Structure formats: structure tokens, C-alpha cells
Amino acid sequence: MTESCLYRGEVVHRRLNPLRNELRYKVFNLFADIDQLDAIASQCRLFSHNRFNLFSVMDRNHGPGDGTPIRDHVWGLARAARDGAEVKRIFMFCYPSVLGYVFNPLTVYYGFDAEDRLRLMIYEVNNTFGGRHSYVIPAGETLTQRAEKHFHVSPFNAVEGHYDFHFSAPAAKMALGITLTVDEAPVLKAYVSGTRLALNDANLLRSFLTIPFLTLKVIAAIHLQALRLLWKGLRLERPPGGATHQVDNLSEG
């Protein structure tokens, strides 16, 4: 049975077109049952739900961003999806807040049925301008999904093309890959992989000491990447105005 845990691993961003560039960095992620966040907090002194701590998950940093409980928002998306009634447990894969700060380029929600089979995936994409867009996609026999890009993420990519998501059900190891394709040419590939660790105070503290200020590192890496791309002459796209939250439910029914 799938259980809440940590995953420690690596993120790789590989830009392929119109120029080549690569960025990789070490990370750790929380993989948690969204109905058990308070229970996890009661068992781990270094983790809290909606309260300041060394590590935390805040409802306001997900979904509509207005403090709506994560589980209410995500279960609402699941129930509106085709075969959503088959989903019995949902886990979120994300960076936790570190000392109150977080930026999650992508939070992934995995929906499992009573037999612990993946039935639904929700990809919650954030940009650095305060926008958020969720893609709700059924998970069947294949471990590849596709969604048209409808959201401004990078100032170096227009809102065009489609995403291909490649994933495996998290177990002792996990892996997730995303490819952005425009006009049949791959533009960007991103990967995250990790090895499972028990979710306890010892591993939380060890993760902090190994990769301190995780999410500051993530946002710094994003901006360093942007400076490199500007230096190489890549053209900027105009960013959107204001914070938004939109949902593409590709499994409604």
C-alpha cells in the first residue's frame, strides 16, 4: 500500500530548441496523503500543516491560493473527472515550505483506487508571476499523458505546443518527465527522480542539512537559468498580468 514518504533525488532541465542549455540540481520532495497532512504533522515535530515550522505545507500555496483546504480543492477536481469515483486516496508530490518559504514549479497529485492502482493525475503548474494552472488527466494502462499548453510558464516560451508527461507509480524509486513540443519539435525536457526515504524527523533534519533552503535554491536556479538564456540571446515572451488559477479537466465526464 502506498504510504507518505520523502523522495531525495535530482531535477534536470534540458532546453533543446532554439538553443541548447542544461541545468541540474539536487532536491528532496514530500509525497503525502492529502487527507493525512494533520496526522503527519502530529507525528513529525519538524513538519506542520498551515503553521510555521522548519518544514510545512500551507493550503494557501496550492489550488486557488485563497486558503481553501488542499484536500477539498483536489478532491473536487477528482470527483469531476471521468472515473473519479474510483479514486480512493490522493497523494501530493511537492516541495515543502522551508522556514515559511516555498516555490513549487510543479505539484503533482497522484490518485489511487482501492487496489492501489493509479487512476488520475493532476499537474498543478506555477509560474513566477503568481499564476497557477492545473491539468487533470486520467491515468490508464499507459504511463504517458498529453495536454495542450494553455499557461504561461517560462518567459522564454510562448503559450503554444503540448506537454507529454511520462511517469511511474512512486515506489522505492520515482521518476517523472515532461517534454514540451512545439511544431513537432521538442523544445524543453524536464525530469525529476528520487529514492524513497521514511517520513520522520531524522530524515527531515538530514534533508535540511544536506540541501539547506531547498526552495530558495530552486528559485535561484530558475533565475540563474534565465540569465544564462538571456546571455545566449534567447528572446523574451511578454508575461501575463496578475495572478490567476485555471483548470483544464481533460477527463470530465
Predicted features and spans:
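Mature, function-bearing regions of proteins
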Residues: M1-G253
